[in-house]
Amino acid sequence: MSQLIKPIDYQSLLDAKQTEQGIKMIKEFFQQNLSTELRLRRVTAPLFVLKGLGINDDLNGVERAVTFPIKDLGDARAEVVHSLAKWKRLSLAEYGVEPGYGIYTDMNAIRADEELDNLHSLYVDQWDWEAVITKEQRTIAFLKNVVTRIYAAIRRTEYLTCETYPQIKPFLPEEIHFIHAEELLQMYPDKTPKEREDAICEKYGAVFIIGIGGKLSNGEKHDGRAPDYDDWSTEGENGLLGLNGDILIWYPVLGRSFELSSMGIRVDKESLLRQLKIENKEERETLYFHQKLLNNELPLSIGGGIGQSRLCMVLLHKGHIGEIQASIWPEDMRTECKKLGMTLI
């Protein structure tokens, strides 16, 4: 069911022309910064993949992919991608990328089962990136280092945006705070995961929550994560599980936490088998991607996705992602947004 967060006294700081120019500037500047910071080179990515190979991202495991038959392949079915989490790792092997280097791509996806609101659209655009790492780098310390560098690129982009449009004032803190999902649960045991995110983000401004996908001490997950890309079951620091997480910020325009990126160190052979067993998905072991990984034909890697429209929305202080990208929205949402000063494209 679609929902609308109504910002109080909202007024767009940019007109339509400035907004389009700002989107272009942010996208070009940030991806250059990301590429330089993590030593990534751009590659061309697919909009769809063949169904049944285990390449598409299953997200939380319940979202349906958009599918269609391909006439010239005997009506074999293709799926529009949800993300390129597993495709990128296959590409690292195909390109023969060495440790310390990686790839990034402009990913466009359709998520037909998304619940529409100010942050969630049917159309998803991300910088999807993946880098080859060594066995010794599969640690929380390495993960934190990469997160810190990505956050630095975000803040540099915020500085450029505020210099270009002085009416936009910076709000991101200098440093990002790290916390494990279990530690967050202990801090706020009576709150829901979303309420915990709001509380910690309002306190620190920018937060990386570690260990998303596995069950916590209350028997529940902080949030879902497919079992076959992020490693959420390997022990990290202080006996806590998980080598992955989310970058979130406190977004004053909407008065709530705001996820910018989901990322992590990827599963190795052992953690893949363990996570498939935990999720009762062991039948996936026979799929193309999983066989490649189990046969040690794929490199160890770290990767993630950074929302393009989301980053632009935050840095341009917009109230709705539909002010940044063209998509389909319920008519009553469009009408209500217009009353609130948010003109959806």
List where the protein language model places each region.
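A generic secondary-structure signal for well-formed alpha-helical elements
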Residues: 34-41, 150-161, 319
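A generic structural signal for short, non-catalytic loop/turn and secondary-structure boundary residues
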Residues: 61, 73, 96-99, 103, ...
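Extended, charged alpha-beta segments that form solvent-exposed binding/catalytic grooves
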Residues: 105-199
